[in-house]
Amino acid sequence: MRPLSFRRRTAQARPDPAPSRLSYRVQRLLLTPLFHALIRVGLPAFVLAFGVGWLLQNQELRDELVAQTIALRTQIEQRPEFMVNAMSVSGASTELIEDIHEVVPIDFPVSSFALDLEAMDRIIGELDAVAEVDLSIQAAGILAIEIVERTPAVVWQTRQTLEILDAEGHRVGPIESRAAHAALPLVAGPGGNRAVAEALRLLEVAEELAPRIIGLQRMGERRWDVVLTEGQRILLPEREAELALARVIELDQAEDLFARDISVVDMRLPDRPTVRLNPDALDALWTIRGLTNDRIE
């Protein structure tokens, strides 16, 4: 038989197989994906950032790094394949090309990295005569600018200036003399620029009167007068002006209205058109009426 003391020593030497609570939590933490990611990515990133930060504490080293970075960037930007040597403008008149060179002065050759095409597009697009603009850098170092100019539609006369407008009323540019653009119809009066489309429709309706028409005058920024030669006028209503003008044209074709001694055809009340005689014709009419009355009496 074995002694009892030996059994007690054996029982005391046996280790406890259950881990401690702290050990269990540490083992679970080591097995989590987040901890693996921190060890694989976070720790190297921290070491790298710490090393770079420690190196950049040296002012001379920082200055050298900045200088090398600038030199490398300049070297890349100045490579021949990135250089722009000339500008090409298409679709623009000579005057507009001069304006473009004035608003976007470029000292060639220049690196394409130094050109802000978006800003240039905005600046050129703000020119009055430009409807559309497209910029691109093409092969052989050419800055290509494609322009769509506004098409002149009317001459707008204000108290101070003469300006050319397109069919939408956008300003194309000022002019010094009406004679230089005599082929364009004349529009006058405040607010005329905001009703160019209507003015063009009226002129189309009044094509039969074209040789007599001097222009259209905006009245009170709400309606049009058609100004004719010999001091004659057609006063149009605010609404359905085209229909009212068409009625006047029909009347002229039937009765040769504007060959008569009249000054105004008032269509502001379309249901009650009014014809106003010239002063001389009115005096003659009153004289005739007076003579007639004398004879009756």
Swiss-Prot record:
Location(s) in or outside the cell: Cell inner membrane
Domain POTRA: 82-150
GO cellular component: cell division site; plasma membrane
Matching InterPro entries: Cell_div_FtsQ/DivIB_C, FtsQ, FtsQ_C_sf, POTRA
Organism: Dinoroseobacter shibae (strain DSM 16493 / NCIMB 14021 / DFL 12)
Pfam family for this entry, one: FtsQ_DivIB_C
Chief location of this protein within or outside the cell: membrane
Similarity section: Belongs to the FtsQ/DivIB family. FtsQ subfamily.
Record's keyword annotation contains Cell cycle: yes
Highest taxon above the source species: Bacteria
PANTHER family listed in its UniProt record: CELL DIVISION PROTEIN FTSQ (PTHR35851:SF1)
Keyword set, alphabetical order: Cell cycle, Cell division, Cell inner membrane, Cell membrane, Membrane, Transmembrane, Transmembrane helix
Record-given protein name: Cell division protein FtsQ
